[in-house]
Amino acid sequence: MIGIVLVLASLLSVGGQLCQKQATRPLTTGGRRRHLMLWLGLALICMGAAMVLWLLVLQTLPVGIAYPMLSLNFVWVTLAAWKIWHEQVPPRHWLGVALIISGIIILGSAA
């Protein structure tokens, strides 16, 4: 159960980061202020919810085990940037993502 909460905290944190990125995107039409407020508001909600879930995780797991699992954020952000904004991800970056996933598996199996 706590593993699900940890993954959800990670996803919400990443969601907040992605909302911040979306808030900075240029608009072709008017409504810049509304666009900015919407995405920043969503970012705050996501980050706040992530913090609450993170506190629940820390009540259960040692921080030395829980914190490295937040490395998943790098994986989620890379995938989202690649899929949503069609950002180029060089092979070296994908190798880094694979190494992060490997590290998470190793650390997770030691818990």
UniProtKB/Swiss-Prot annotation:
GO terms for molecular function: carbohydrate derivative transmembrane transporter activity. Disulfide bonds: none annotated. The chain crosses the membrane at residues 38-58, 61-81, 91-111. The keyword Lipid biosynthesis applies. GO terms for biological process: lipid A biosynthetic process; lipopolysaccharide biosynthetic process. Keywords: Cell inner membrane, Cell membrane, Lipid A biosynthesis, Lipid biosynthesis, Lipid metabolism, Lipopolysaccharide biosynthesis, Membrane, Transmembrane, Transmembrane helix, Transport. It is a multi-pass membrane protein. GO terms for cellular component: plasma membrane. It comes from the Bacteria. It is found in: Cell inner membrane. Belongs to the ArnE family. Heterodimer of ArnE and ArnF. HAMAP family: Flippase_ArnE. This is Probable 4-amino-4-deoxy-L-arabinose-phosphoundecaprenol flippase subunit ArnE. It comes from Salmonella heidelberg (strain SL476). The gene is arnE.
